[in-house]
Regions:
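Surface-exposed, charge/polar-rich loops and edge strands
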Residues: 1-50, 58-216
Length: 216
C-alpha cells in the first residue's frame, strides 16, 4: 500500500511540474508577443539622428558619419545561397565606431567589393544587437577572407577604437552588388509549441496514472 501511495505522489508531483512548465511558456508567449509589438511600433516611427545614447534595438536611425577604410565579410546564407554580410565601421567620434551591416553580397562578388570604396553616404537603417558567437559557430580563421562571427574584443584591438554595442542594419540602397536589408524583426517565438508539448505530456501522464490506478 505504501508503495502505491509513493507512486501516486510521484505522478502528482511530475504532473504539477509539467503543467507549471506549460503555463510558464504561455506567460513567455504573451511577453514575447508584447515585445514584438513594441519593436514593430519602433520601426513605424520616423528616423532619429544616430547618437551614442541610443541603447534599444529596432530604433530607426540615420547616420551621417565617415566610414573607415575597412570591411568585414561575415559568412551568411541568403535564401539558401552562400554569401556574405558586408560590415563596415563608421566613426562615431575619435575613440568609437559603430558597425553598419550594408547588406548581403554573393560569394563571386566579394573580390570586387574588397576594392570598392564606399562614399560617406547617409545611412538609413535600424539598431540591432551584435549577434554573439554560439557553441555551433566555427572559430574565425585569420587565413580566410571572411568571418563566422564578429569578435568585438579582437576587432577593437585591430581598429584601436571602442565599438558601439549595437549594430546598424542599413536599409537604404548602397552598392549595386549588395542586396539591401529589409525592415524585419527576427525573434523566435515558439512558446506556443512548447506549451502544447508540456500540456500534452501532462495529459499523457494523467491518462497513464488513471490506467495504473485502475490496474492497481
Amino acid at each position: 500500500m505504501s508503495k502505491i501511495k509513493s507512486l501516486d505522489i510521484l505522478f502528482i508531483f511530475f504532473t504539477f511540474i509539467v503543467l507549471c512548465l506549460g503555463t510558464w511558456q504561455i506567460i513567455r508567449l504573451y511577453s514575447k508577443n508584447d515585445l514584438i509589438i513594441n519593436l514593430e511600433n519602433n520601426l513605424k516611427k520616423s528616423s532619429v539622428s544616430f547618437n551614442e545614447s541610443i541603447n534599444e534595438e529596432y530604433i530607426k536611425v540615420s547616420l551621417n558619419k565617415k566610414n573607415l577604410d575597412s570591411k568585414l565579410f561575415l559568412y551568411y546564407l541568403h535564401k539558401g545561397e552562400i554569401g556574405f554580410k558586408v560590415i563596415i565601421p563608421y566613426e562615431v567620434n575619435d575613440s568609437q565606431v559603430v558597425l553598419v551591416d550594408k547588406g548581403w553580397v554573393k560569394k563571386d562578388k566579394i573580390n570586387l567589393l574588397k576594392k570598392t570604396l564606399f562614399s560617406n553616404e547617409v545611412v538609413e537603417g535600424y539598431t540591432k544587437k551584435i549577434q554573439k558567437k554560439n557553441l555551433f559557430t566555427p572559430d574565425n580563421n585569420i587565413k580566410e577572407d571572411f568571418l563566422y562571427s564578429v569578435e568585438i574584443v579582437s576587432l577593437q584591438k585591430s581598429l584601436n577604437k571602442n565599438i558601439y554595442p549595437l549594430l546598424i542594419v542599413q536599409t537604404s540602397k548602397t552598392s549595386k552588388d549588395i542586396i539591401p536589408n529589409n525592415y524585419e524583426i527576427r525573434l523566435s517565438n515558439n512558446h506556443l509549441q512548447y506549451a502544447i508539448t508540456w500540456y500534452a505530456l501532462a495529459l499523457v501522464t494523467i491518462i497513464f496514472f488513471l490506467f495504473y490506478r485502475k490496474k492497481a
